Amino acid sequence: MILRAQANGGQPGSPWLVFLHGFSGDCREWQQIGEQFPDFSRLYIDLPGHGDSADIRVSGFADVCDLLRNTLFSYNILKYWLVGYSLGGRVAMMAACQTLPGFCGLVVEGGHPGLQREAERDARRRSDGRWAARFRREPLRDVFTDWYQQPVFASLDASQREALVALRSQNNGETLAAMLEATSLAVQPDLRARLNARTFPFYYLCGERDSKFRALAAELSVPCHMIRNAGHNAHRENPAGVVDSLAQILRL
């Protein structure tokens, strides 16, 4: 089984850019950014429970990484960078910590490396369980209206919140709930030690208004590109800033 994706060709010999969206997003999320790199072949993936992969269920990160590996193989992708936001960043970090043939490097925007204390895991398990229950039983517009009131999205203004609520409400609540539970931070291992011992290039993107993830980036001993005038969803709030950072990373 493979994940659904959209592919765009680039110059032969250049590595692929493999884009992984955040929770409740889909393969369209990164396309505005990816279009600015026409020399690179680009693969925009729908993660399980999302977009055209909504019917794909997983039991945890191991399943997601297996599906990612199968998808890359099916497209004959032999050399690539992983670029992921939030949930997609966590999947990318998990995958990068495994042995992946052809892997060139990792770019993560606002992705959590993992919780360190059991009490934090327990609290996150309860929180994600409550959200999952709401996704299953309530209108998605109501759930996402509350979702985007969380502190991590404090930099969004009213119109930005409304646009995201309208967009995310097109999802399937049941499949979102299943993916939220399967890939909760409560079940993700703490990746700090493995990432700090990495042998591959790793870059972090963070909105300057995203204080939580700025602090997390500092724990990773990784080059961090601060995106001006942006919060947690930097590639949406300041796409030009993210394009500039990616261009620097890819040495364009």
Curated annotation (Swiss-Prot):
The UniProt entry, under PANTHER family, shows: 2-SUCCINYL-5-ENOLPYRUVYL-6-HYDROXY-3-CYCLOHEXENE-1-CARBOXYLATE SYNTHASE, PROTEIN PHYLLO, CHLOROPLASTIC
> What is the source species?
Citrobacter koseri (strain ATCC BAA-895 / CDC 4225-83 / SGSC4696)
**Could you identify this protein by its name?**
2-succinyl-6-hydroxy-2,4-cyclohexadiene-1-carboxylate synthase
- Which pathway does UniProt place it in? Quinol/quinone metabolism; 1,4-dihydroxy-2-naphthoate biosynthesis; 1,4-dihydroxy-2-naphthoate from chorismate: step 3/7; Quinol/quinone metabolism; menaquinone biosynthesis
Q: One Pfam family of this protein, by short name?
A: Abhydrolase_6
Q: Which domain of life is it from?
A: Bacteria
NCBIfam families for this protein: menH_SHCHC, PRK11126.1
Question: Per the record's keyword annotation, is Lyase included, yes or no?
Answer: yes
Q: Which reaction does it catalyse?
A: 5-enolpyruvoyl-6-hydroxy-2-succinyl-cyclohex-3-ene-1-carboxylate = (1R,6R)-6-hydroxy-2-succinyl-cyclohexa-2,4-diene-1-carboxylate + pyruvate
Name the gene that codes for it.
Answer: menH
Q: For this UniProt record, give its keywords in alphabetical order, as a comma-separated list.
A: Lyase, Menaquinone biosynthesis
The entry sums up its family as follows: Belongs to the AB hydrolase superfamily. MenH family.
Q: What is its EC number?
A: 4.2.99.20
Is the keyword Cytoplasm assigned to this protein?
no
- Summary of subunit composition and partner proteins: Monomer.
Task of the protein:
Catalyzes a proton abstraction reaction that results in 2,5-elimination of pyruvate from 2-succinyl-5-enolpyruvyl-6-hydroxy-3-cyclohexene-1-carboxylate (SEPHCHC) and the formation of 2-succinyl-6-hydroxy-2,4-cyclohexadiene-1-carboxylate (SHCHC).
Q: Which GO terms describe its molecular function?
A: 2-succinyl-6-hydroxy-2,4-cyclohexadiene-1-carboxylate synthase activity
